[in-house]
């Protein structure tokens, strides 16, 4: 499915999947089920690097701040390296402002 998306969206999704996998593997209390790379600020893509300074991820029906740098292979089909930092829980009153779906209403 990822090859059918626009290039920028595909790269964000590829890095978002990597973020969920790495968070789940290294931070056992979290079980991420969604990432919004552009939640609190625009994503930047430069050459083969995707940087999301204002991303968010959802775990256990709560949203948390996330920043990541995702370096892609030369063909941009896979992740070469990935670094991330998890932030604080995002208050529910800010979810709509950041386009973060309420887990109770999310149909995706």
Residues covered by each model-derived region:
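Mitochondrial intermembrane space
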Residues: 1-108
């Amino acid at each position: 499915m990822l090859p059918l998306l626009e290039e920028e969206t595909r790269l964000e999704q590829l890095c978002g999947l990597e973020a969920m996998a790495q968070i789940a593997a290294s931070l056992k209390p979290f079980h991420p089920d969604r990432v919004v790379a552009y939640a609190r600020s625009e994503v930047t893509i430069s050459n083969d690097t995707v940087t999301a300074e204002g991303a968010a991820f959802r775990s256990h029906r709560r949203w948390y701040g996330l920043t990541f740098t995702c370096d892609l292979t030369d063909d941009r089909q896979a992740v070469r390296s990935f670094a991330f930092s998890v932030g604080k829980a995002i208050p529910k009153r800010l979810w709509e402002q950041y386009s973060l779906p309420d887990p109770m209403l999310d149909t995706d």
